[in-house]
Design a protein with these regions (language model features):
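Intrinsically disordered, low-complexity, repeat-rich regions
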Residues: 1-112
Length: 112
């Protein structure tokens, strides 16, 4: 339980305000509401926490979590620094979850 809390604190310390600002923007992002952005930020942080705690498991993000992740990745320096802080190395994005057959779709469905 202690490791989960430490990981939650670590992931919680990642500064995501610039990403949230872009997600709310209708010009630079999808124009999400502030409420939706806060909710998806919470789920994104939970996703990162699960990936950190279970590195050998396939953890598949929802579409909204994946969108948040994409906007995080676009700030390449920040994303690399955040990955180093949380994972100790770069956390690669794999965009094909759920689209490579039944087993892949089952992994997607199992995660969320």
């Amino acid at each position: 339980m202690k490791d989960i809390r430490k990981t939650q604190e670590l992931v919680g310390s990642v500064y995501l305000e610039p990403i949230k600002f872009t997600l709310v923007s209708r010009e630079e992002g999808p124009g999400w509401t502030v409420e939706k952005t806060k909710l998806i930020e919470m789920w994104y942080r939970r996703f990162l926490t699960l990936v950190k705690i279970y590195p050998n498991q396939t953890i598949v993000p929802t579409k909204d979590i994946d969108t948040f992740w994409h906007y995080h990745i676009l700030d390449t320096r920040k994303y690399m620094d955040d990955c180093d802080k949380v994972f100790g190395s770069y956390f690669h994005h794999f965009p094909y979850f759920g689209s490579r057959g039944e087993e892949d779709k089952a992994n997607f469905d199992k995660t969320f």
